[in-house]
């Protein structure tokens, strides 16, 4: 899989799930906590500020680069004896069984499994095979994504500003950096 330097925010609930499954120690060194969120709306007087301390939480969420998250997940899966990861691989057939499926890969290898997850992209062979519905909505926006260094260290503060053209967000990252996501009309 290809993982790039874009950052994602993990909710507090997602982090709790990683703790429950024993994966958090692998993720923690790569994460930056979101301890405060400031939300504003251009052209309106209202604004909101959320603080993890107000909710008795160590953080409202965590920010991690996709590359670090991907590598961490791969290492975690490699450490699980009951997970057999095939990557890259291309499915050619799926045969339903009473309890699971038999998968045939393009190279002819066959695998039987009780669980098959349709997480193979926007043109999912698995989704198409099982005729799973797709819901799409074009927001007619593009996102400008960058990692920026600001004059002041973000220190756990995230910012989101809603504008007529789309939202603008800054997420705190490690080493005093921030992830910028700026949605602009297409």
PLM features: residue spans?
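A short, flexible beta-alpha/helix-coil linker loop
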Residues: 1, 53-57, 151-153, 185-186
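Short clusters of hydrophobic/aromatic residues that line enzyme substrate/ligand-binding pockets
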Residues: 8-10, 27, 48-50, 126, ...
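Conserved N-terminal helical subregion
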Residues: 30-129, 136-142
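Residue-level signal for inorganic ion chemistry
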Residues: 18, 73, 170
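Glycine-rich FAD cofactor-binding loop and adjacent beta-loop-alpha segment at the N-terminus
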Residues: 1-35
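Conserved FAD-binding catalytic core of PHBH/FMO-like flavoproteins
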Residues: 116-186
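Short glycine-enriched, charge-decorated loop/helix-capping segments at active-site entrances
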Residues: 2-9, 55-58, 132-133
């Amino acid at each position: 899989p290809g993982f790039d330097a874009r950052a994602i925010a993990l909710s507090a609930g997602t982090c709790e799930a990683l703790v429950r499954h024993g994966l958090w120690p692998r993720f923690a060194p790569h994460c930056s906590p979101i301890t405060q969120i400031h939300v504003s709306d251009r052209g309106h007087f209202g604004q909101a500020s959320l603080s993890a301390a107000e909710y008795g939480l160590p953080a409202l969420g965590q920010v991690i680069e996709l590359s670090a998250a991907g590598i961490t997940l791969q290492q975690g899966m490699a450490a699980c004896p009951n997970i057999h990861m095939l990557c890259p691989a291309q499915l050619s057939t799926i045969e339903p069984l009473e309890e699971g499926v038999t998968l045939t890969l393009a190279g002819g290898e066959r695998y039987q499994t009780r669980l098959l997850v349709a997480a193979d992209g926007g043109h999912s062979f698995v989704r198409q095979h099982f005729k799973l519905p797709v819901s799409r909505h074009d927001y007619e926006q593009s996102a400008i994504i960058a990692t920026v260094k600001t004059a002041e260290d973000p220190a756990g503060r995230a910012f989101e500003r809603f504008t007529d053209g789309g939202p603008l967000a800054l997420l705190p990252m490690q080493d005093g950096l921030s992830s910028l996501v700026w949605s602009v009309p297409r």
